[in-house]
Design a protein with these regions (language model features):
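Bacterial N-terminal signal peptides that target proteins for export
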Residues: 1-10
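Bacterial N-terminal signal peptides
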Residues: 9-18
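Aromatic- and Gly/Pro-enriched helix-to-coil junctions and flexible linker segments
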Residues: 19-144
Length: 144
């Protein structure tokens, strides 16, 4: 008779385990500095039709997302500046999840699935924008 309660407990344990949601054990991808330096920073510096460059507003000290100022006469950041930009920008992403990363959702138009709280305008009309895809690739761990 004692075997019956143990069998019932074992069966219940199997049922509970089988019905429990499966948690992902996959680690978030690492953010690649070289991809950031080469591809992501280029997006920040690019002039987009009807928009100012991301860099123009985000080099100001009063922004929550602050990029380093370019050195006088420079058209790109030096190594030290790029490292600082990488650290700052990394704080705005959820590695492996572009759709929950502020870096991608705030400048994306609400009609394209973006956040309504970006005062700098809509840099990207949709997730099909090539520059949005560059940022998403970086967040997803793409390497050079």
């Amino acid at each position: 008779m004692a075997a019956r309660p143990i069998a019932t407990i074992a069966a219940a344990t199997v049922l509970v385990a089988a019905s429990a949601p499966q948690l992902s054990t996959r680690a978030a991808p690492a953010l690649d500095y070289d991809f950031f330096k080469t591809r992501v920073q280029a997006v920040f510096l690019e002039k987009r039709p009807t928009h100012t460059r991301c860099y123009i507003c985000h080099a100001e000290a009063n922004n929550g997302f602050r990029l380093e100022r370019l050195s006088p006469g420079a058209t790109a950041w030096n190594e030290e500046q790029s490292r600082k930009n990488f650290e700052m920008t990394s704080k705005l992403v959820n590695a492996g999840d572009p759709d929950t990363s502020r870096l991608l959702m705030q400048p994306l138009a609400p009609e394209g699935g973006g956040n309504v709280f970006h005062s700098g305008g809509r840099q990207f009309a949709s997730k099909d924008d090539p520059n949005w895809k560059v940022l998403a690739d970086w967040v997803n761990g793409k390497k050079l």
